[in-house]
Amino acid sequence: MSSDITGTAAWQKLRDHHAQIQSVHLRELFEKDPARGQELTVTAGDLYIDYSKHRIDRDTLGLLLELARSADLEARRDAMFAGEHINTSEDRAVLHTALRLPADASLVVDGQDVVADVHEVLDRMGDFTDRVRSGEWRGATGERIKTVVNIGIGGSDLGPVMVYRALRHYADAGISVRFISNVDPADLVRSLQGLDPATTLFIVASKTFSTLETLTNATAARRWLLGGLGLGNEAVAKHFVAVSTHADRVAEFGIDTANMFGFWDWVGGRYSVDSAIGLSVMAAIGKERFAEFLAGFHAVDEHFRTAPLEENAPVLLGLIGLWYSNFFGAESRAVLPYSNDLVRFAAYLQQLTMESNGKSVRADGTPVPTSTGEIFWGEPGTNGQHAFYQLLHQGTRLVPSDFIGFGEPTDDLPTADGTGSMHDLLMSNFFAQTKVLAFGKTAEEIAAEGTPEHLVPHKVMPGNRPSTTILAPKLTPSVIGQLIALYEHQVFVEGVVWGIDSFDQWGVELGKTQAVELQPVLTAAEEPAAQSDSSTDSLVRWYRRQRGRA
């Protein structure tokens, strides 16, 4: 059985330490240690990370690192990189880090050279996307491809759509990418609106080629394509490719298995954007930029693998997240990128973090004795400032925040008076928000400005709201890879300390099964039998009446 981390000496010391530090304000911490703004920073690849605005001191850090060592973090990290089967419930290795190993690396797992396998697929992806981007690949009517449509869900959608939007400036071949994920037909109808079937290529991303939502949408897309072209099934092979490992099902659909790109059981969906699941991204930005994307991941992988825990960005940030979850009782973390190109980053992190660490049992099947799984959410700045920052600043809930910003913009324009940069204006808001969250403004300071007495309490900014600042020179393919890897490894750190399996997702399965069972109940011509609970029974009957099926 896994040891109970809450019974370790390090956990008890942290509990005692929290009792002492919980009422200490960040103002006091900075007054006591004026250099903390320079010293409580860490660099990983191109990422400059300031964690000084957290409710920690050097004793906190020492105790958190002691906790990590009590959980055998370093050995668990090494086991993951070595390909040991750390996903115990599914008896699998966890090797998303192998997806970005350079071609001259070597990693043999279960008797297979996984690096050679990875680069064989990458080479095939590169050859295929070169043909699409150059116009060599033609549709069934002889026209070149202008739009790629990725059909997938979960990790087969969230990663590609996030990265494509982040790297839109690098889409240089005149190919746009759209994404279909939801089984709600409105998603497909909207996504196909205005497209020409003759110039559209679909990527169907499903490892088993049996995912209900994906195959439903792919079938509808095939119907749209053939109807629009006025051609038979032979046209499918010119307009559909697959990311899958199930050749029989792919061929049955009408896709040439020569255009099927596989990945492996040791890659979880939420860790797969740098695998063949990223084919749509490669089609947009090209294989050279995709290689830079992978190199960014690898840079942070190597940092995580080799840096001492005291200087290890994912370790420090993961432990700080755990500090708030388990000792301050915080339930969520806001992710606030000051880049509109990262509009889908928070949604991507929701799956990465919450599907990984939203567990109530440990790897050995025993109950987790403490809270797990931070709730991730957020929006790009400055939009969030006019929506939910009120709660961050003056609400009663503690919400640690991650601010992500860039030295150079992907776009820039003059300010309203024509004398400045809109990016500078954006970043002035960025730095102001982290400052105000940390230090706030006291009642005395507000009263001294002549504020009417009855308004003073309403205008007090309490501060002491923690945040991490993550800066990079520019949002590039390498940098987005680095950002993703930074959060991937934070997830791992928290999961190891909690003793959970961060790489399975059994909690999503029962709902799928029940949906399959309920579909004929909703659609049958005859009145259905009573459901097992009165709520579901009455809801099903309401829906049937709306659809004219009494």
Swiss-Prot record:
Reactions catalysed: alpha-D-glucose 6-phosphate = beta-D-fructose 6-phosphate
Pfam families documented for this protein: PGI (PF00342)
Enzyme Commission number(s) from the entry: 5.3.1.9
Lineage: Bacteria, Bacillati, Actinomycetota, Actinomycetes, Mycobacteriales
Annotated active site: 355 (proton donor), 386, 512
UniProt GO MF annotations: carbohydrate derivative binding; glucose-6-phosphate isomerase activity; monosaccharide binding
Annotated localization: Cytoplasm
Keyword Signal: no
Name of the protein in its database record: Glucose-6-phosphate isomerase 1
